[in-house]
Amino acid sequence: MSKFFIDRPIFAWVIALVIMLVGALSILKLPINQYPSIAPPAIAIAVTYPGASAQTVQDTVVQVIEQQLNGIDNLRYVSSESNSDGSMTITATFEQGTNPDTAQVQVQNKLNLATPLLPQEVQQQGIRVTKAVKNFLLVIGLVSEDGSMTKDDLANYIVSNMQDPISRTAGVGDFQVFGAQYAMRIWLDPAKLNKFQLTPVDVKTAVAAQNVQVSSGQLGGLPALPGTQLNATIIGKTRLQTAEQFESILLKVNKDGSQVRLGDVAQVGLGGENYAVSAQFNGKPASGLAVKLATGANALDTAKALRETIKGLEPFFPPGVKAVFPYDTTPVVTESISGVIHTLIEAVVLVFLVMYLFLQNFRATIITTMTVPVVLLGTFGILAAAGFSINTLTMFAMVLAIGLLVDDAIVVVENVERVMSEEGLPPKEATKRSMEQIQGALVGIALVLSAVLLPMAFFGGSTGVIYRQFSITIVSAMGLSVLVALIFTPALCATMLKPLKKGEHHTAKGGFFGWFNRNFDRSVNGYERSVGTILRNKVPFLLGYALIVVGMIWLFARIPTAFLPEEDQGVLFAQVQTPAGSSAERTQVVVDQMREYLLKDEADTVSSVFTVNGFNFAGRGQSSGMAFIMLKPWDERSKENSVFALAQRAQQHFFTFRDAMVFAFAPPAVLELGNATGFDVFLQDRGGVGHAKLMEARNQFLAKAAQSKILSAVRPNGLNDEPQYQLTIDDERASALGVTIADINNTLSIALGASYVNDFIDRGRVKKVYIQGEPSARMSPEDLQKWYVRNGAGEMVPFSSFAKGEWTYGSPKLSRYNGVEAMEILGAPAPGYSTGEAMAEVERIAGELPSGIGFSWTGMSYEEKLSGSQMPALFALSVLFVFLCLAALYESWSIPIAVVLVVPLGIIGALIATSLRGLSNDVYFLVGLLTTIGLAAKNAILIVEFAKELHEQGRSLYDAAIEACRMRLRPIIMTSLAFILGVVPLTIASGAGAGSQHAIGTGVIGGMISATVLAIFWVPLFFVAVSSLFGSKEPEKDVTPENPRYEAGQ
């Protein structure tokens, strides 16, 4: 094939140009992400049961729906949360690769079976089924800079004017408003109700009857009488629109003709639909809308579309109102991709310099460099065809591929120049002769590297997604690299290289190149003597190799494990939890103290603080608070002001707060997999021991975790049990008094729980009507005595006649995991420890808990456990594939052993480098390790291929091995050094995405250094030992190790 294109160079140019054109067009179409869709698809079910407790929601809603979800295809696990405000969320997580649309349809079908079994109030509120991920993409805030609007005004404006266009934006999966729109609030006065012998049920019935929209029909509607000349629509009663209209609702007409209207027994006016959440931006009144990304949507495209939507709405904002983005996860995407692109450019420059140093021929260097854009652009074309995106993983793979793809071109150019020098052939003939020699080695290298990396593409789970990005990208680049080396590079060599006189290869004697050549030649001579010594003393060096293998195994066992390295995402969370039963006012004091510290003491690091009272990731309630902290851009912060340093300083300060627990934590590397770094585990009541015992086990776990030196920031992702007032109805007493249980329950629900009646029209938008007791009538248990129920005789009976209560404790938030009650616990490894070590410690502590209490990993921890179990199989498959490919290539079962034996020599270096830098055995490390295995095997192939040919030509095993080493040392050193320097920018990167770059770069550089330095000495030993062991025949005229050429180093 190469000969065809050597004779037709323009044909080769056309192919290269077409490849580049296709790649350039693909770049314009490829989406840009920080990561591909790593998180498994998740379908969320959201329900509201007004006035219900967390236990009531769990018993009457959650369990009913959960029981129907069984049997859905590819369902991985189900988790649920029930809150004391009546809200509930069930999240069904599916196996990676499941079509989210199909999953949503199946969930909806199962939900249809459960809906008739749910309380009527729940069905009336509606059930939402959405495709969503755990984390927020960004938060859109409205802030009143002049203080002219309250938080309730801003929340109403968001819901009324911004929520709909934002929810329609492509890529938006779900959203959460920090606040609520206006509602018509009817505040009942129990004393006035009793005075007029009315009950809350009477009021609700009257409002429902008189606030209606009537369809009154038409005059002259069809079918009509003959001769009808008029057709007109009849406008009947419409929904009420103002507080005055509601105040005029007639409740009662007395015998004397006097009337009791709603305004006589209640205060009516616009108010918040609920008052659970309030927000501030840098201390100013604000409201916000947190957006979640739809499953499979592109983060950058969605964020861009949302900003354009807000830009279109801004001209219509009220005076003094400004839109802000107090939390945004997309800047890290653009910064990290930009950083990797810079790394890519730096890698190309460094590789060019290394090639020029060794080739010492500008034309030869240009030839090898010209292959880079062809292969890289061609790879983008393959990524587009495979449905991939431009993301951190594919760009990392491109950086690794640079060193690999120039290897093939270097081997071609180097060998062409060697043939011209040794045989005195002109460039065209030398190229043909050279390609006959190295074509097999090039194909072999491509097969081996593909064999190492392709098994990664077949693994499942989130780890499999990461592996596939690397695998397909590098294998595609390698495949194109070999094609270019067989098609384009020979054509360039035949037409661009100048002829060399015999013996002129690398003969520069003056200047820097002369100094370099002299020293390199001396090194080659010393290297030949060393190889000769090793081949004469095989046993000690084979024992040394065995020690290396033992050391590799020992290091593998000691290096800490993790899933992904931590990243500075430019954002930080702070979570506030005041004592159980605390009021919102008490929580706000702590939130204000936290905000003041961040904005004043950390002004060099923090850009803005958006605080929310009434909500955090652990749950909702008056004792909960949250802060979304945006940091300044990476180039404005030093390492001392990284998100991790800030979190550590802030946590130390928050420990001084006596009236609350405050945790500062960074988001995880992959935001789709959760809201915090570290581990995520559920303690489960598998033995049915009950809530109290589960709470005791949780507290026991937290106490032991606090004593562990391996764990830090261990906290429940839930709320502590808080005071609850248990109201007991004496059914017999109530019956004797003529009061029905239905009237009692309805009165309680309306007076204390805020009962939804129906809707009204406010400025052209449909909003809700709520009835509730006025605040002064529901502040303490004694206020229950103010409420009355009418009996069958028309008498007003106070609650104290048939009800009594007592204080108990209960949870404001209940969680379930895979069908059993559970409690979620979050935490992080202590400084100096990895998540793998932290998870092992969690398993140890969980094993000491009372019987009946189990645990299950979830989120990123689930993926980490899955990836750890896959690693041995991945390595075994990769090594097996390498062996089989080499066996097919060499038609030998023994020769491949000499190549495979080099693998530990690369792994040991990767382990040492990773350990010395304090990094972990994570997914990136494993990708780098597999790359190192392929490169180590590549170096071995370059020696073994030539040694095998020389031996078949009649050389002894010893002579063939040493001659192959001498011939291939320069290209091995050159390609290895080019690859190492190409990866150096990854190891010294800073800013966004630096953690990932360090993780992959450190292991690869360490592995390549050891694979190069050690392999050039051990590979000839492996070749000779394996060939001797399996009975390779020596030629009759043997050249013994005592031959003087070994001593002369020739």
From Swiss-Prot:
Q: Which GO terms describe its cellular component?
A: plasma membrane
According to the record, what induces this protein's expression? The arpABC operon was not seen to be induced by carbenicillin, chloramphenicol, erythromycin nor by hexane, toluene or p-xylene.
Where, per UniProt, does this protein localize? Answer: Cell inner membrane
Keyword set, alphabetical order: Antibiotic resistance, Cell inner membrane, Cell membrane, Membrane, Transmembrane, Transmembrane helix, Transport
Membrane topology label = Multi-pass membrane protein
Gene Ontology MF: a single term: xenobiotic transmembrane transporter activity
Q: Which residues cross the membrane?
A: 10-30, 339-359, 370-390, 393-413, 440-460, 472-492, 539-559, 871-891, 893-913, 923-943, 972-992, 1004-1024
Q: What are its GO biological-process terms?
A: response to antibiotic
Q: Which Pfam families match?
A: ACR_tran (PF00873)
Please indicate if the UniProt record lists Cell inner membrane as a keyword: yes
Which InterPro entries is this protein grouped with? Answer: AcrB_DN_DC_subdom, Acrflvin-R, MdtF-like
The family annotation for this protein states: Belongs to the resistance-nodulation-cell division (RND) (TC 2.A.6) family.
Q: Function of this protein?
A: The inner membrane transporter component of an antibiotic efflux pump. Confers resistance to numerous structurally unrelated antibiotics such as carbenicillin, chloramphenicol, erythromycin, novobiocin, streptomycin and tetracycline. Is not involved in organic solvent efflux.
What is the protein name for this chain? Antibiotic efflux pump membrane transporter ArpB
Name the species this protein comes from.
Pseudomonas putida (Arthrobacter siderocapsulatus)
